[in-house]
């Protein structure tokens, strides 16, 4: 097999791209890139998905954001298919996900019917009903799955990503223990929650670190920079000084939600500034 030169060049830039977008998780990115590169080069087993990941860690540390950036880099926009598994906790909600025997497709089946390639993202997988966990055993072990509506689907063009907050309290409590020790504690808790045969089928199981103050600042700078650049392209020049920057960091990153509120905070703050400036310039 001789892979296309342009594909090799593209994959050569993958790790650098992800590192520029995701901060504070340098131990995660090389492991993720290894699986993605094998998948894109056709080196994964042909009877399995392109690759599979279990991302563990607190809310707002980059698990979902990393998945989004992987999808954006490899496939462009619109190739990530996200499922909030907390919506499928109860037995009567399982058919909404898997379909039912009458032939009515569920949400997963509808995605697989209309797409053949991309990333399937299952957020907070630990909250799903146990019947759905059984599906993951099948999904990770074979490139073809049959859902409750009796339809069979091909997953050989997809990456599967599951995120979980299992063990997050181990990472969030004040401690001087090294991260490797905390990581082992998280994985031990994972094994108390899921069956070993399910855990063992993921290509990579990675634990994300809580965000340090320096990392929080870096994330804020990235989000602000992206927004400022967008406004610049609209002909609006902005410069964020130190005092409002610190305010954005304090309000955009919380202990409970990590950096998840940052984009919304920056959008509101800078959007209000731009709105007032546009009004003063009589632009609307």
Descriptions of predicted regions:
Residues 1-284:
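AAA+ P-loop NTPase nucleotide-binding core of proteostasis motors
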